[in-house]
Amino acid sequence: LEFRRVLFRSGKLAAEDANLSGGGVANAFSGAFGSPITAKDAPELHKLLTNMIEDAGDLATRGAKEKYMRIRPFAFYGVATCNTKEQDTLSKNGSYPSGHTSIGWATALVLAEINPQRQNEILKRGFELGESRVICGYHWQSDVDAARIVGSAVVATLHTNPAFQQQLQKAKDEFAKRQK
């Protein structure tokens, strides 16, 4: 019975993660972070994460996706995903590596740096975002594993960018003020 509950919770979370859009990445981490990450509640942090999405996602993964054009599990097996509206579009681009996972893991690394007191919860949530891609049939496990490496490399590279460093410091300062 407990196993069924775990499977149900995992499937429900995976379906929710499949619908990330707009501020969805920031919203997905609000619970793990311990406070809302919205443009209203944490404008500097929200801006930092919004700016990172393209770097960690499409820009970081597009080349490999185009080169390998690995078929996605749902297309390979002919089954539905957690969000059938995306299936047609996703079946036309490569599975390897997972852009969503790269974004999720990069976000987790940066948030854990800003709020180290909650790093376990944050990193767990980042890990779960990737696993959701496997549960929903969008990606193979190796797509997700590779994407975590990509996300880590993106964060390391972003730390050499003065604009990123400046925005990161603003987000850290904003977070510190909110903690007082």
Regions of interest found by a model, annotated:
Residues L1-I135, T160, Q167:
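Hydrophobic alpha-helical bundle signature of multipass membrane enzymes
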Residues M69-F74, V144-S152, K172-F175:
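Short alpha-helical linear motifs
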Residues E128-H159, Q166:
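Interfacial helix-loop-helix junctions of multi-pass membrane proteins
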Residues V154-K180:
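C-terminal membrane module of polytopic membrane proteins
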